[in-house]
Design a protein with these regions (language model features):
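Helical hinge/lid and interdomain linker segments adjacent to catalytic or ligand-binding clefts
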Residues: 8-98
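Short, solvent-exposed loop/turn segments at secondary-structure junctions
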Residues: 16-17, 68, 96-98, 174-177, ...
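Catalytic beta-strand/loop cores that center a nucleophilic Ser/Cys/Thr
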Residues: 5, 34, 42, 119-196
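Proline-centered loop/turn at the N-terminus of a beta-strand
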Residues: 88-90, 168, 198
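A glycine-rich, often tryptophan-bearing local segment used as a flexible ligand/cofactor-contacting loop or short
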Residues: 70-144
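Extracellular ligand-binding/catalytic regions of CAZymes and related secreted enzymes
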Residues: 1-8, 36, 178-186, 193-231
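Short aromatic-enriched loop/helix-cap "lid" or pocket-rim segments at secondary-structure transitions
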Residues: 22-24, 55, 101-105, 182, ...
């Protein structure tokens, strides 16, 4: 790591067909915000980089649509140790695909990750459409520079259960602004797990159009900067 830079982030993107366009657009986006904010970044779609030895050089890990079931048992263990050691984690969109329905044959279910996510599991989302994010907590460093609400076109992830009460909810989906699959009512879409030093989940950000959304770009930037902060 260049010692003139304050921290280094590893961004591991999904190889899933549905997310290839986002991954391709995200690489130059993250390179730009790293340069503008003076930190180092490595971007890859190779999950083999998730190992204890390699992760030692990073202060922040970003799961860009990489689902928990995309990782092997040893990769899951390495990431869990990374998070439990107090380093930063930013999970984007498909990073929240927790649930036993997704366990692959011959593999175990990563129960720790479900609890880390706030004790919720993914429920099938409605059609891609425009909706509104309501920023509930503008005191948090990740959301303090956001407007009270912003529109975004996305897959509005739904969950079995509500993380509120087990996490600090920063923003909710305004279900009156789009057609839901299974209405949640109170619908957290961005939250942090304060049981860990620096961990934030961002449920929106399905495709490259999100990277042209000013509020969303601010959210990603500030989430990474917060996840890397020492205080």
């Amino acid at each position: 790591m260049d010692m003139t830079l304050p921290f280094k982030a590893l961004i591991v993107a999904s190889r899933a067909k549905d997310h290839l366009q986002m991954s391709a657009s995200a690489e130059p986006f993250f390179a730009r915000i790293a340069a503008e904010n003076h930190f180092a970044v490595d971007f890859t779609d190779d999950a083999e980089t998730i190992n204890e030895e390699n992760l030692e050089q990073y202060q922040v890990f970003v799961m860009l649509h990489l689902a928990p079931f995309d990782m092997t048992y040893s990769q899951q263990e390495a990431l869990q140790e990374f998070i439990e050691s107090g380093k930063g984690w930013v999970g984007i969109h498909a990073a929240g695909l927790a649930g036993k329905a997704f366990v692959r044959s011959g593999t175990r279910y990563w129960q720790w990750f479900e609890e880390f996510l706030g004790g919720v599991t993914y429920s099938p989302h409605p059609a891609y459409q425009k909706g509104t994010v309501l920023v509930d907590d503008r005191r948090h460093p990740a959301t303090q520079n956001l407007p009270p609400s912003f529109e975004i076109s996305d897959e509005w992830y739904e969950f079995n259960g509500n993380p509120r009460g087990r996490t600090r909810v920063l923003a909710t989906a305004d279900e009156t602004t789009y057609k839901q699959n299974k209405p949640m009512g109170d619908h957290p879409i961005i939250w942090t797990n304060e049981g860990y030093r620096r961990a934030i989940y961002i449920g929106v950000g399905h495709d490259p159009s999100a990277l042209t959304n000013e509020a969303y770009c601010i959210l990603l930037r500030d989430s990474i900067l917060w996840a890397a902060s020492a205080s």
